[in-house]
Curated annotation (Swiss-Prot):
Binding sites annotated in the UniProt record for [4Fe-4S] cluster: C438, C444, C483, C487
GO biological process: cysteine biosynthetic process; hydrogen sulfide biosynthetic process; sulfate assimilation
The protein's role, per its UniProt record: Component of the sulfite reductase complex that catalyzes the 6-electron reduction of sulfite to sulfide. This is one of several activities required for the biosynthesis of L-cysteine from sulfate.
UniProt-recorded name of the protein: Sulfite reductase [NADPH] hemoprotein beta-component
Organism in which the protein naturally occurs: Geobacillus kaustophilus (strain HTA426)
Underlying gene: cysI
Length: 573
């Protein structure tokens, strides 16, 4: 195939590119600065590199101003993210994470929207011990953050449960294949001996990434229709499993999704991935690699906010990018096969799997595993992990599946669920069961407003409106993020709130219930009083005027309340 004439955008490299180039494959001076006793933080250059190792330097923003008044440095702490491909963890791994959360972190575990674990509040002096314990449990934090391929997602509880093992295996293979090859991680955290001599020549240590890795983060997810729980179109690469006659026939390939944008900058926008073809299962790892290398070579390394793959595709053209992918593969993708998505939520409660096994999906509000005064969630899960013989699966909706429970073990697990009052969410409204929120304040440095701490309280008030209109069991997706970067995939929710300032949010409406359409800006910079007033009007109209089976996101478009977004490039129109 002839080489397509593509070019990377002009402009000087960003400072992050300099940091990566000079880092000697992610080493920087991390080994030294993490040992420096004079500060609980680390320099900015090393913090940029720290992300590749799976950690962010943060501080407690609740006390930041008071600390400044006292002329004290911020209360620095580290967030550590554990990559768990497909969200699968053993009971032994769960117990390790539980112990680390209580010993070194803030006493809680965060289940993320990318099926990973997060520990918050880890002090600098405890980071290395935490990293070593995580690796001792056969998990890793390498490439959980940074300009690399992140945690690979996959549906943890498909309707065709026999397909899960195969799809999960491919998710793991993709994840392993795209891990950075540098020894820096092992040297710094696991006391591996340093590589002798001078640093290797460019490309030798990173055969896929090269010395400057990717222009920006890169995300991959695998969906198994009819469930779109991974929000496959939000991914840089979305693989849609095609199951024929109960067997995995292959994957449709979608490219160029991404949720992030910048307030006030219309050159930034969310975008949905577009399907470009089909590949067989044994081709999926190669396809993922070749697609990622196109972004490596042609992505924007000058402007970080325009560096995601979605902008590369929109700049070069979908067909040109597809041709370049196929040129690198040396063969053409097949024709995309039919598929259908029904929803993007979880299947709560007990679901029967194959070979006499059962899966229990637990509702975990905000993905936060902790012991509350009246709800010992963390303790209950710890006790279950001690006797569980299957696995745990973190869902893309921040919930948890106690999976592969044998019929013999089920009564014991049921007894512990009952003892600790662990809930499948059925006592809550369908709206709350379909809610997502990012961490935001007080630890995220990018947050402009609350999300995880505020959404449950806002839902208490929205639920009064829901009940007034007889919509308690109506499935509506609602999501909140503290900034427009989109960690909770906000613009794929039928109702979305994006933090603009403390107590103020932009409100979006009209995304598809099954994650196949973006939402549209409806109101800007509004507070709680106006949010509730708008929702009272909207939900009242929906209850009275909806068609049979019509979802809320579809209704607001049909009723002319917001315009339909047909592509990310017209998101701001």
């Amino acid at each position: 195939m002839a080489k397509v004439e593509l070019k990377a955008p002009d402009g000087p490299p960003s400072d992050v590119e300099r940091i990566k180039q000079e880092s000697r494959y992610l080493r920087g001076t991390l080994a030294e600065t993490m040992e420096d006793p004079l500060s609980a933080g680390i320099p900015d250059d090393d913090n940029r590199l720290m992300k590749f190792h799976g950690s962010y330097l943060q501080d407690d923003r609740d006390v930041r101003t008071e600390r400044q008044k006292q002329k004290l440095e911020p209360t620095y702490q580290f967030m550590i993210r554990v990559r768990t491909p497909g969200g699968v963890a053993t009971p032994e791994q769960w117990l390790v994470m539980d112990e680390l959360a209580r010993k070194y972190a803030n006493g809680t575990l965060k289940l993320t929207t990318r099926q990973a674990f997060q520990l918050h509040g880890v002090l600098k002096w405890n980071v290395k011990k935490t990293m070593q314990a995580i690796n001792g449990a056969l998990m890793t934090t390498l490439a959980a953050c940074g300009d690399v391929n992140r945690n690979v997602m996959c549906n943890p509880n498909p309707y065709q449960s026999e397909v899960h093992a195969e799809v999960y295996e491919w998710a793991k293979l993709i994840s392993d294949h795209l891990l950075p090859r540098t020894r820096a991680y092992y040297e710094i955290w696991l006391d591996d001996e340093k590589v002798a001599g001078t640093p290797p020549v460019d490309g030798e240590e990173e055969p896929i990434y090269g010395p400057t890795y990717l222009p920006r983060k890169f995300k991959i997810g695998i969906a198994v229709p009819p469930s779109n729980d991974v929000d496959v179109f939000s991914q840089d690469i979305g693989f849609i499993a095609i199951v024929e006659d109960g067997k995995l026939a292959g994957f449709n390939v979608a490219i160029g999704g991404g949720m992030g944008m910048t307030h006030g900058d219309k050159t930034t926008y969310p975008q949905l991935a577009k399907v470009i073809g089909f590949c067989k299962p044994d081709q999926v790892v190669e396809v993922a690699e070749k697609i990622m290398t196109v972004q490596r070579d042609y992505g924007n390394r000058s402007s970080r906010k325009h560096a995601r793959f979605k902008y590369t595709i929109d700049r070069l053209g979908l067909e040109a990018v597809k041709e370049e992918i196929e040129r690198r593969l040396g063969w053409r993708l097949g024709e995309a096969r039919p598929y259908h998505f029904e929803h993007s939520g979880d299947r709560y409660g007990w679901v029967e799997g194959v070979n006499g096994t059962w899966h229990f999906t637990l509702f975990v509000e905000g993905g936060r595993v902790k012991d509350y005064d009246d709800y010992k969630l963390m303790t209950g899960l710890r006790e279950i992990a001690k006797v569980h013989t299957g696995d745990f699966r973190l869902t893309p909706n921040q919930n948890l599946i106690i999976a592969n429970v044998t019929s013999e073990k089920k009564p014991e697990i049921e007894a512990l669920i009952a003892k600790y009052g662990l809930t499948d969410g059925r006592r809550y409204t369908a709206l709350r069961r379909n809610a997502l929120a990012c961490v935001a304040l007080p630890t995220c440095g990018l947050a402009m407003a609350e999300a995880e701490r505020y959404l449950p309280k806002l839902l208490d008030k929205i639920e009064e409106i829901i009940d007034e209109n007889g919509l308690r069991d109506e499935e509506i997706t609602i999501r909140m993020t503290g900034c427009p970067n989109g960690c909770a995939r906000h613009v794929l929710a039928e109702i979305a709130f994006v933090g603009k300032a403390v107590g103020k949010y932009n409100m979006y409406l009209g995304a598809a219930f099954n994650g196949t359409r973006l939402g549209k800006l409806y109101r800007e910079n509004i507070g709680e009083e106006e949010i509730l007033r708008e929702l009272r009007m909207l939900l009242s109209r929906y209850a009275k005027e909806r068609l049979d089976g019509e979802h809320f996101g579809d209704f607001v478009i049909r009723a002319g309340i917001v315009k339909e977004v047909t592509d990310g490039t017209n998101f701001h129109d």
